[in-house]
């Protein structure tokens, strides 16, 4: 999508990517139907807000991936707190679908886990 405004500083236009921050499947389906969805970000807290249980979070991520398709990244957050737990959870999340991006908390343990996951070729982002 290309947006151009009247501001002279935006003469070349700006690139905008629309990432939806939700765990609600109906919201994701609607946004995907617009044709402008660049990705989905979610976490267990958002999943809990729609009545989801932590032990079903990985299955729910699979359902999201099925809705958006393989070319749309889905950031799924690990709730683990130690490096080893984050790495283990990140590996499990990455096995769900090729478009999963493991979202890791920005903390010392998360930084160490990110290094390991990225070295294994697992897409990672930090929040």
Report the location of each language-model feature.
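Short, Lys/Arg-enriched N-terminal segments with co-localized hydrophobic residues
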Residues: 2-15
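Active-site beta->alpha loop and helix N-cap motifs at the rims of alpha/beta catalytic domains
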Residues: 16-20, 24-28, 34-36, 44-123
């Amino acid at each position: 999508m290309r947006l151009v405004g009247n501001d002279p500083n935006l003469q070349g236009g700006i690139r905008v990517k629309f990432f939806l921050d939700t765990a609600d499947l109906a919201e994701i389906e609607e946004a995907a139907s617009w044709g402008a969805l660049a990705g989905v970000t979610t976490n267990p807290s958002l999943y809990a807000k729609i009545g989801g249980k932590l032990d079903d979070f990985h299955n729910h991520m699979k359902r999201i991936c099925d809705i958006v398709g393989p070319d749309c990244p889905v950031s799924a957050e690990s709730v683990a707190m130690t490096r080893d737990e984050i790495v283990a959870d990140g590996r499990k999340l990455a096995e769900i679908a090729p478009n999963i991006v493991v979202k890791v908390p920005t903390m010392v343990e998360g930084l160490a886990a990110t290094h390991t996951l990225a070295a294994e070729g697992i897409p990672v982002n930090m929040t």
